[in-house]
Amino acid sequence: MRAARWIAAAGAAVTVAAVVTVTTTTSTTAIKFPGLPASAGSLTFHEGDYLWPKGHKGTEHESNAAAAAAPDPGNNLIYGGGAAPGSISQTPAVYLVFWGLQWSKTDPVTSYLQKFFQGLYGTGDDWTTVSREFCEGVATGEISCPAGVPHVGGPNGPLLKGVWFDDTLPAVPLTAGVLNVPSIDQMGAEAVKAAAHFGNTTAASNTQSQYVVALPSGFLAPGEGYYCAYHSAVDSNYGSVAYTNLPYLNDVGSLCGQNSVNAGAAGTYDGFSIVGGHEYMETITDMRPRTGWSDSGGQENADKCAWISSGQGAMGNLTLSTGTFAVQSTWSNTFNGGAGGCVLHAG
């Protein structure tokens, strides 16, 4: 668990680089967040929910393939008691941010991610439907949702509401064996900056929205402690801003999903839809980690089904109007007669 951290942005008007003070229990440090509007006010950063690479100890639900099919109501997700609206996404909206001047608009990853989010909720999508059993506004600890409460739903219009190439350099890439990865504070500040860019400067405009911040190549390398992605939230004058940190996954190849479903060239970008989809499905059911749906051990719907390669809940393809994309399964409390399990396609 990561404790919340409080940040105050100086100034009363939009600034080119707001200077903020990060206060922790041990130190106070001045940091610059380039382009962060002062109107964002004080920022409070919350814990992230991490997706670890294949084979990382403790990442996968113990013996995932077996657990996916094992009838056990004790495995089910429970409601965390968060405020409604805002614990789940009733009308999801995605804003895609390519952060860093190293990005090229011709990089195939940029079009792959856009097409993936553009295709969801359209023809052929029986994958996001799995999430619609979850809700908000029920008692803490509930494992089911009555018909009369707000459920996870579909978007108003297209899911992908905007795309932004932010050509600010977020951090120094891998140099001389030293990996300088943007901190959770820097990533959260970029999400708030993106909210301002898209005009979402009220709490209401961010209640259902999430910002997928994609990093360019050079910010992810194999080693102890690295992750494939995470999602989190940051509180600001714009409300609570939910976001995903999505690194350039092909920097570590199959460890974060490349060719996990499709062989050869067809699977080059598998990781981006598997991991991007993992974080998306977690965010719409747990917008602010642990306020929505997770199990007694803190695992969210996609964590419980990560990297299953065979049997019930195995990763597979999702064919949409915009293309074919590799995705993983997510947890359903209603599967197996209420015992729960990992489901790729809603029945």
Where do the protein language model's features map onto the residues?
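Active-site recognition of the HExxH zinc-binding catalytic motif
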Residues: 96, 274-286
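Extracellular structured ligand-interaction cores
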Residues: 74, 91-93, 208-210, 269-271, ...
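Secretory targeting and sorting signals
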Residues: 1-29
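Structural motif marking the loop-to-transmembrane transition
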Residues: 3-4, 269, 273
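Flexible, surface-exposed loop/gating regions in the mature catalytic domains
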Residues: 134, 139-270, 283-286
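N-terminal carbohydrate-binding/catalytic regions of secreted carbohydrate-active enzymes
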Residues: 31-191
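Metalloprotease/metallohydrolase-associated module, dominated by Zn2+-dependent proteases
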Residues: 226-270, 286-347
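Acidic glycine-/aspartate-rich tracts in secreted/extracellular proteins
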Residues: 102-103, 218-220, 289-290
